[in-house]
Amino acid sequence: MVDVGDKTTTRRRAVAAGTFHTTTKVIDLLRESALPKGDVLATARIAGIMAAKRTDALIPLCHQLALSAVDVDFTVADDHIDILATVETAGKTGVEMEALTAVAIAGLTL
């Protein structure tokens, strides 16, 4: 793991995006709140946030970070759902991996 001990603590922010492709039928069910597993967007949002907080356990050689904010947002279109994760911290290393992990796990949860 890279030694970041001598780096200066600064505000850090990363944004990652992804797209979940599906059918119009699934999107219609989602919009009607008729999916059998309930509110999938809320579940995927929570999964993405939890994943960002656990990135160091999921990705080898990632530093454990105290995150100050994690937001996972969705934009629902006719045949896909766009996922946008924003992660912030005040630390010695960036939060890019945490943002990417949030998007990946939110997408898998969908």
Residue ranges and their predicted role:
Residues M1-L41, I46-H63, S68-T109:
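C-terminal binding/interaction regions
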